[in-house]
Amino acid sequence: MKKNIYLVTKYDEVNLRNGPGLNKLVLFKILKKGYPVKVLEEFESWYKIVDYQKREGWISKTQLIKTPYGITVKKDRIYKFPNMQSKQLALAKENYILKILKCKKDWCKIEDTQVTGWIKKKSLWGID
């Protein structure tokens, strides 16, 4: 089975187009650096991608990097350790981007500017 490839946006503004090329229509702009996308196919210097909201389009390869970020698909708690009995450090809102440091079974260690802790893996999109 082919492994999923996840990349993230390199800049605060990235165009998602209806085809591979600068002359193609911009469907919408992704306005967040570190926004995770899944690669569906590759054509020359372009990737066809899908995001967690199932929006598809083409992004130039120069606009994406391989850095482990995930986006929360639902609101969930961030814990000090990878179990629900440990201290709750924060509450991550839905659609929140977190840097993924590592994952163990059902948990991922994450960080953002305010907290480093553990969140349930099933709450994140952008990692298998």
Model-derived regions, located:
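SH3-family beta-barrel domains
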Residues: 1-20, 29-33, 40-80, 87-96, ...
